[in-house]
């Protein structure tokens, strides 16, 4: 869906509609809280780009476009918990300067449709993601999905 706006000079502006975009401020607060408790980088994205990020490295990922591979995994409703050297590890961003040591990716589902993802990332070699990080992401994704209904 598209949103149609006009600017002051009367020009028409077309903008792709993002249901998560409506929750950007709220998603930002949720990402802040989750990043603080989990101790990692948290990104909340729609099906195109990051709409909220918090934690160490947030400035590098804010508003970055997600990779086609990630879009495909989300469309298939796949959750991912992977270490950087594992086969199931995927690059999260289209233009990703570095690989992360760990990633946890959970799709956000609203009224039966995938509308985005909650992504937890870590660059810390000493840290190990477990089912706990996956459950934290699932909790956030479930909550955000319900907020958009």
What do the PLM-derived regions correspond to, one by one?
Residues 29-97:
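Structured interaction and signal-relay segments at domain junctions
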Residues 102-109:
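A short, aliphatic-rich beta-strand micro-motif
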Residues 6-17:
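Short, basic amphipathic alpha-helical segments that act as recognition/interaction helices
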Residues 4-6, 43-44:
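Short beta-strand
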Residues 21-33, 64-72, 117-149:
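Juxtadomain coupling helices with adjacent low-complexity linkers
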Residues 53, 116-117:
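Short glycine-/small-residue motifs
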């Amino acid at each position: 869906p598209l949103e149609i706006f006009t600017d002051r000079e009367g020009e028409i502006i077309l903008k792709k509609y993002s249901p998560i975009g409506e929750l950007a401020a709220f998603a930002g607060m949720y990402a802040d809280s989750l990043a603080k408790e989990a101790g990692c980088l948290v990104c909340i994205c729609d099906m195109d780009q990051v709409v909220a990020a918090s934690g160490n490295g947030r400035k590098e990922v804010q508003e970055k476009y997600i990779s086609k591979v990630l879009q495909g995994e989300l469309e298939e409703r796949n959750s991912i918990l992977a270490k950087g050297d594992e086969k199931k590890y995927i690059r999260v961003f289209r233009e990703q300067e570095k690989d992360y040591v760990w990633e946890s990716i959970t799709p956000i589902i609203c009224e039966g449709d995938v509308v985005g993802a909650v992504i937890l990332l870590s660059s810390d070699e000493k840290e190990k993601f477990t089912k706990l990080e996956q459950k934290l992401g699932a909790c956030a994704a479930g909550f955000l999905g319900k907020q958009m209904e």
